C-alpha cells in the first residue's frame, strides 16, 4: 500500500535537519534555541520567534527567563556540545547512541527529558519528544518526564533510560509523524496537513 505524505514526513524532512545541525556548532546552537523557544509555545509561533532571536540575539523579546539562561549556557558550551554529539554519532550505535545523546543534551541548561529527546530527534533522528500532547494521547505516566539534575549520576541515568525506553516502544519516526498529524488537526487554519507541520521544522532552521 502506498504511504501517505504524513507517514513518510520524518524520512523526508528529518535527515535535512540532521545535516543542518551536525554541520557546525553555530547551527547546533540554532537548533537548540528552536527547541527552547518551543517551550509552552504553539509550534506555529516558533518560526517568527527564531527569526527574532537570530536578528537580536540575547536582546530578542522571546529570549527571557530560563530561555536566556539556555542561550548563555550555549554561548559558553556549544563547541563542546557539538564535539561530544558528533563523537557519539561516530562511536555509538542503537540504544547506546540514544542514551549517550540524551546524556549530552540533558546537560544543556533549561532542557528536561522531553526537550533533550527533541534535540536528539532533530540532531540525529533518534529518541523523540514525549511532550504534554504525547503524554495525553498515549496515556503515558507523567513520571517518565521527571528528572532532578541535582540527583546522583546513577539516578539520572535510570531516569534517562526510562525515558529512552518509553520512546523506543513507539519509534522515533512514529512519534514525529503522529505528533505532526495531531498538531495539524488541532490548528487546521495554520497547517495544510501533518506533512506541512513536519516540513517547517526544517524551514524554520534553514538560512
Question: Can you say where each PLM-predicted feature lies in the sequence?
Answer:
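Short alpha-helix boundary/capping elements
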Residues: 37-45, 79, 127, 142, ...
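Structure-specific DNA junction-binding interface
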Residues: 1-69
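C-terminal accessory module of base-excision DNA glycosylases/AP lyases that mediates lesion recognition
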Residues: 1-20, 26, 68, 83-86, ...
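Alpha-helical ds-nucleic-acid-binding substructure associated with the helix-hairpin-helix region
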Residues: 41-109
Amino acid at each position: 500500500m502506498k504511504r501517505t505524505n504524513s507517514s513518510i514526513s520524518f524520512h523526508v524532512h528529518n535527515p535535512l535537519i540532521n545535516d543542518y545541525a551536525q554541520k557546525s556548532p553555530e547551527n547546533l546552537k540554532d537548533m537548540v534555541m528552536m527547541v527552547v523557544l518551543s517551550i509552552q509555545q504553539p509550534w506555529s509561533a516558533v518560526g517568527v520567534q527564531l527569526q527574532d532571536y537570530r536578528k537580536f540575539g540575547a536582546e530578542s523579546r522571546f529570549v527571557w527567563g530560563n530561555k536566556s539562561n539556555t542561550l548563555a549556557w550555549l554561548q559558553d558550551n556549544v563547541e563542546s556540545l557539538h564535539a561530544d554529539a558528533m563523537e557519539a554519532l561516530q562511536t555509538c550505535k542503537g540504544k547506546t547512541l540514544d542514551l549517550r545523546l540524551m546524556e549530552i543534551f540533558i546537560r544543556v541548561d533549561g532542557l528536561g527529558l522531553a526537550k533533550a529527546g527533541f534535540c536528539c530527534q532533530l540532531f540525529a533522528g533518534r529518541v523523540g519528544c514525549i511532550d504534554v500532547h504525547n503524554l495525553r494521547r498515549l496515556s503515558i505516566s507523567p513520571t517518565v518526564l521527571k528528572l532532578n539534575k541535582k540527583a546522583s549520576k546513577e539516578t539520572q541515568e535510570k531516569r534517562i533510560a526510562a525515558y529512552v525506553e518509553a520512546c523506543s516502544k513507539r519509534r522515533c519516526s512514529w512519534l514525529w509523524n503522529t505528533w505532526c498529524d495531531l498538531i495539524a488537526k488541532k490548528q487546521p487554519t495554520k497547517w495544510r496537513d501533518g506533512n506541512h507541520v513536519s516540513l517547517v521544522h526544517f524551514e524554520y532552521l534553514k538560512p
